[in-house]
Each structure stands twice: as C-alpha cells, then as structure tokens.
Amino acid sequence: MRRKRLSEEDFVAQKTAEHPCFDCGAGKRNARIHLPVAPKCNIQCNYCVRKYDCVNESRPGVTSVVLSPAEAVDRFKKARKAIPDLTVAGIAGPGDALASFEEGAETLNRIRSIDPDITFCLSTNGLMLPFYVNHIISLGVTHVTVTVNSVDPTVGAKIYHHVTYLGKEHTGEEGASLLLQNQLSGIRYLSSMGVVVKVNIVLIKGINDHEIDEIVYMVKDCGCKITNIMQLIPVKGSAFESMKLISQSQMNQIRKECENILPQMYHCRQCRADAMGTLEHDLKHDIV
C-alpha cells in the first residue's frame, strides 16, 4: 500500500517533533549533530568569547576544532552509523552560520546527497538573514534559530560592542538598530515561507531583563513559533564576565509569564558548536 504523501505543513510538523532543540519530547529521544564549519562572526557580543580549540568548556561559541566541509561530512557519516536516533544536522558556529555561509552551504549540500531525510537547521544572529533567506530555503533548511537580545537600540548598544555589516563597522545604537532591522525582516520572511523559527534570548540582569516580554511579542508578530529565554553565561575574558545572574526561579517565572505569548523552551543545554548526541548524553568524545 502506497504511503500517503504528507502536506508541506505536516512534513515540517513531523520534523519539528523530531528536533531536540524545538520539541521537549525530542530532546529526550532524538539526537542532533552540530557541525563546526562556521568560524567567522560579524558582531561582537559583550558576553561572547569564541574558542576554536577548547575541549573543556560547554557553551555556544566553543569547539575543539573548526572543520572543513569535507571533514564535517566525514564526521556526519560516523555519527549516523553510531547514533540510530540521529535526526538533525545543524550549523551553530563557533561563529555565525551566515558569516561563513559558503562553508555551511557546501556542508549541507554534501550531506543532503547522502541522507535525503535528515533535518537541517542553523543558528544565526540574523544580521545577514535578508541576504541569505532564499539560499537557506533552497538548501532545505526547515528550522532556524535567531538570537534576538533586544528590541530597543539603546539597550542593544549595551549588549553589542560592534556590528560589522558589508565591510563597515557600526557601534552603539546605530549598530544595534541595523542588527534588529535585519533580524526582524529575516524572521518575517523565513516564517512566511514555512520555515520554523525559534528565537533565543540571552537574559542579562540589569540590561535587558525589563523587555523580555516585549521581545517575545515582537518576534511573535514576525512569525516566530517558540522562544528560548536563556541564562547569561559569564565567560571569562568577556565584557560581561562579572555580570550578576538572576536566579533560576526568577528565570522560570519570566518564561512562565511569556508562555502567555508564545511557547517557551525549558530544556535548552546551551550546547557547544560541536555537540553530538542527545541533549542528555553528548557522544562526541566517543565517536570523533
């Protein structure tokens, strides 16, 4: 008996149900692999220090090595053999996926040729989304995560040291405003084309904690399906290394309040750029 072909909407819904970073149930049963092929970044967040040869820290922006597209495909093949529940291949750094887009696109194209069913996702700060949305869609990427930390340029100016756009460095409110404009237009277009968008929000006590609900409202209006409000990681060497944190109970209360606007993610592990396995059990050191 011929299997009924899924509608595009049902197809994406099925992939979402198998994506550990978009579905809580999938976080327990499905595995993902992050392929660290994107070393460049076009903004400098005051909470970020990227590391390309680190084996100890567990946070975004960190990888033990940056891979070429060919090396990334080899790693994917090994992971696919070793992890039966591998359903997602993503590009999440260690820089920004769209600042090193050629490497990411080549990687995903090669993987698609050997695995037509794998779900593709990528994470980005959103600065270059208006330039690459059609390319992202043509690659078969169904899930995109955009980090939006402020919808007020006066606040964004405190979070971003600078934004480098089309070869020019922008600072202060100018840079924050440019970034926000591109983030929102990119989210709006991706959502209109059926791509599932999740927005990550790094909550920074005393800086953007007063506008979290406003961020959630605004990205909802652009078509975002879920938001992930995350605790700041005070990285040594960053401008925010001494920043105080809110309590976990306060964090969960903010998430609970924002659930009235959009579904919230509670199970994020703030993974490395080379994470592999389920959210509970990283298998990179067992496979690589």
Describe the residue ranges of each PLM region.
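Flexible glycine/acidic-rich beta-alpha junction loops that bind and position SAM and/or redox cofactors
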Residues: T154-H161, G206-D209, I226-I246, C271-L283
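C-terminal accessory region of radical SAM enzymes
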Residues: G194, L245-E280
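Active-site mouth loops of central-metabolism enzymes
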Residues: G61-P69, I204-D209
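Short Fe-S-cluster ligation motifs
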Residues: E71-A92
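Short glycine-centered, acidic/aromatic-flanked micro-motifs in structured strand/loop junctions
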Residues: I91-P94, I201-L203, R255
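Short glycine-enriched, charge-decorated loop/helix-capping segments at active-site entrances
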Residues: R59-S64, Y160-V163, G172-E173, E241-L245
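N-terminal [4Fe-4S]-dependent radical SAM core
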Residues: M1-P36, C41, R50-V66, K78, ...
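Conserved AdoMet/S-adenosylmethionine-binding subsite of the radical SAM
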Residues: A97-M230
